[in-house]
């Protein structure tokens, strides 16, 4: 089915996503928002005729529920997990065979991080599929893939003398209590 001009549910691709889940051992599906996670999980569950164990993981779920999903992942008891950025970092789930990113990844760094969740075996590369939600996201997905292939990172490099940190510090000092401007200037210069 063709990618629609608008929308963010990716409903058009759910049957193909389900087929990929059936073909792989464990699939991690990343989405950008909680509502996308809920909708995708619901759509996958609706067509889950084989009753594959599919779970949901995002920040609005009860911490106990998230821990249950994480424990099931650690036991290799799940075939798929639909997740937001809550599973971007942290524990490496070595038995994840495939990452599917639903919607544009919103940057090469995020894409690389999410692809890195899959396949920590030495003899095989990580596998990922990008599923744009609409035709405009096709371009974003292509740009993120190209940037990732080139090793480009879209996160600004940290550096000495970051002005945003300085401004936050000065604002914090100013809001906390009376201060001596000369002392603050000397602190900043040190």
Residue positions per predicted region:
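Helicase motor core with emphasis on the C-terminal RecA-like subdomain
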Residues: 1-176, 181-190
């Amino acid at each position: 089915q063709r990618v629609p001009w608008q929308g963010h549910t990716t409903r058009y691709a759910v049957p193909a996503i389900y087929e990929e889940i059936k073909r792989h051992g464990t699939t991690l599906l990343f989405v950008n928002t909680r509502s996308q996670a809920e909708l995708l999980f619901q759509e996958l569950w609706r067509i889950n005729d084989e009753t594959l164990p599919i779970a949901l993981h995002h920040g609005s779920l009860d911490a106990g529920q998230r821990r249950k999903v994480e424990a099931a992942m650690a036991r290799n008891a799940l075939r798929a997990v639909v997740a937001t950025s809550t599973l971007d970092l942290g524990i490496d789930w070595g038995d994840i065979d495939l990452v599917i990113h639903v919607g544009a990844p919103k940057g090469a760094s995020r894409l690389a991080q999410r692809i890195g969740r899959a396949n920590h075996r030495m003899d095989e590369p990580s596998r990922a599929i990008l599923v744009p939600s609409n035709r405009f996201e096709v371009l974003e997905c292509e740009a993120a893939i190209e940037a990732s292939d080139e090793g480009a990172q879209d996160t600004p490099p940290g550096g000495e003398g970051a002005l945003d940190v300085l401004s936050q510090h000065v604002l914090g000092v100013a809001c906390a209590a009376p201060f001596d401007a000369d002392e603050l200037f000397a602190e900043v210069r040190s």
